[in-house]
């Protein structure tokens, strides 16, 4: 190992996807960057199914070609079966973005090593087997015990230990990026602002199989990953084929219920894993077929968490160091890369004097929080359906599949709302958010739902915005729908692709050699609608038909 420098401009703690990506982007700007990774590469990690956005993000640091030529399993889309009585929905990456819009299923030890080495090839100084033990602050701030400390002071140095020799050292820096994964040294040790999502308090058990069947053989969807809701509504299972000949198969279940079921059946984790697949995941078990289980059962729990802030001046938090939602919809690496790009963009902007550190760090927190919240809404609404399979939330009553629902989900499932400079992403993303919100606060009574929708149509037709003859419950249904649909207007929320997302009056400048932030240019017309105008009426799909759903804007 070459000597670790005594000083650098940016220290990146952690060489996983988020840290390596941030380091690559920074180093390509000529910024002196050091990466310290606690483990030795290659090292194991779960989270093997990527989103279509990854290609666009990797292309920015010229890493997409390495992934393309490596031999990972190409992922043309993904199948989701949320209801045992309906055929699975499918999100088609190729239909959405063309024949080269596929993603990959990856062996993370190999994919993460590719990204780590690429950071070095981009000019960063990379060191694995070196763990950061503590961070030192200039003028540290104190808060009462148990209280979060959202600005612990200016970070100036880190103490590290070399795993092999136990030798300790210190490195000074101007900026720090915490990409330490689940450890989350800044959030857990200094800011103390991590919080777990009780609604996603699940446990995951998984392992690897050989000799399994393929999903949809002989079709354009062949060998896509498959996800299935468990038939007792306790969770879901995944089936992800990998290029080394194995298939990753996992089960995610409510933690309390899983513990109870294991105790009642007197099963250990391995027995419980196989019992779940055999009894309440029939379609996935059919895909396993005569496959052979070739690993131990691995377990993770309490893995869904977030934080109130992902930065403070001279510090940025990225990826799992800040938050993790759930394996569903494969959001982990996408959030790691987009937050890594945000960290690099805002640090570069600060170094170039385009913004001060207060604004730069705030921009990063808002950007990371926005991406996290969008995926959280999707995942929560999906769990609503998984845990109430006889009360459709994502599909209309007369549908036999979830294709329409997932056409709304498409920009988030594929990550294109953050990665692609696509004019449609605003409209598509708003549809997704509106749809997720509608699912998140469902109207239990079908008659109330129908009456509310009819009244909303009448309000548009009569031009008064008045909903006549509604009961309190029906009015509540109207409010549930309309409150979330307000996201379509410019004065409430604007969510664009990463390259056009304006936060605090600044948008990213995603150009190598001048990466940073620039002032938002004046736009002609209003920004509320997808075509540059505020929509006076919004719509929802009901039983396959588009229905105006909003009152007139005043």
From Swiss-Prot:
Pathway: Secondary metabolite biosynthesis; terpenoid biosynthesis. It catalyses: ilicicolin B + FADH2 + chloride + O2 = ilicicolin A + FAD + 2 H2O + H(+). It comes from the Eukaryota. Pfam families: FAD_binding_3. Induction: Expression is induced on AF medium. GO terms for biological process: secondary metabolite biosynthetic process; terpenoid biosynthetic process. Ascofuranone is a specific inhibitor of trypanosome alternative oxidase (TAO), and quickly kills African trypanosomes in vitro and cures infected mice. As an essential factor for trypanosome survival, TAO is a promising drug target due to the absence of alternative oxidases in the mammalian host. Flavin-dependent halogenase; part of the asc-1 gene cluster that mediates the biosynthesis of both ascochlorin and ascofuranone, a strong inhibitor of cyanide-insensitive alternative oxidases and a promising drug candidate against African trypanosomiasis. The first step in the pathway is performed by the non-reducing polyketide synthase ascC that produces orsellinic acid by condensing acetyl-CoA with 3 malonyl-CoA units. Orsellinic acid is then prenylated by the prenyltransferase ascA to yield ilicicolinic acid B. Ilicicolinic acid B is further reduced to ilicicolin B by the reductase ascB. One of its GO terms (molecular function) is FAD binding. It comes from Acremonium egyptiacum (Oospora egyptiaca). Belongs to the flavin-dependent halogenase family. InterPro entries: FAD-bd, FAD/NAD-bd_sf, Flavin-dep_Halogenase_NPB. FAD binds at residues 15, 18, 48, 333. Chloride binds at residues 331-332. This is Flavin-dependent halogenase ascD. The keyword Transmembrane does not apply. Its EC number is 1.14.99.-. Keywords: FAD, Flavoprotein, Monooxygenase, Oxidoreductase.
